[in-house]
UniProtKB/Swiss-Prot annotation:
This is Small ribosomal subunit protein uS8. InterPro entries: Ribosomal_uS8, Ribosomal_uS8_CS, Ribosomal_uS8_sf. Part of the 30S ribosomal subunit. Contacts proteins S5 and S12. It holds the Pfam family Ribosomal_S8. It comes from Shewanella denitrificans (strain OS217 / ATCC BAA-1090 / DSM 15013). PROSITE patterns: RIBOSOMAL_S8. Belongs to the universal ribosomal protein uS8 family. The lineage of its organism: Bacteria, Pseudomonadati, Pseudomonadota, Gammaproteobacteria, Alteromonadales. One of its GO terms (cellular component) is ribonucleoprotein complex. One of the primary rRNA binding proteins, it binds directly to 16S rRNA central domain where it helps coordinate assembly of the platform of the 30S subunit. One of its GO terms (biological process) is translation.
Length: 130
């Protein structure tokens, strides 16, 4: 059976891994998942990620903790296959008053809500991370 929403699966694996205090989580790799992992690393929500080149590429995300607590408090899918959510540059949400990020898929690639506002572009809101 095929996976209906691979991005939601990725976010759930991260959420469950941190709830169980795992060091890392593994999942099937895809270009969009790697781009999301890169954004999460750049913003300091995860320690790192690696893509294993095998017959079926696998993405391993190393989770980050601070004083024994997960750095990611909430990670929530917004736009999904059954209901796409698009926002213009002026409508992009500020997650937790600017403490969190919204990952946005724009015509210029995947970026945070702050970067999208600076570039003056809107797009599909993939998820919220705080």
């Amino acid at each position: 059976m095929s996976m209906q929403d691979p991005i939601a699966d990725m976010l759930t694996r991260i959420r469950n891994g941190q709830a169980a205090n795992h060091v890392s989580v593994k999942m099937p790799s895809a270009k969009l998942k790697v781009a999301i992992a890169k954004l999460l690393q750049d913003e300091g929500f995860i320690t790192g990620y690696a893509v294993a080149d095998e017959a079926k590429p696998e993405l391993e995300i190393t989770l980050k903790y601070f004083q024994g607590k997960p750095v990611v408090e909430t990670i929530q899918r917004v736009s999904r296959p059954g209901l796409r959510i698009y926002k213009g540059k002026d409508e992009l949400p500020k997650v937790m008053g600017g403490l969190g990020i919204a990952i946005v898929s724009t015509s210029q690639g995947l970026m945070t809500d702050r970067a999208a506002r600076q570039n003056g572009t809107g797009g599909e809101v993939i998820c919220y991370v705080a």
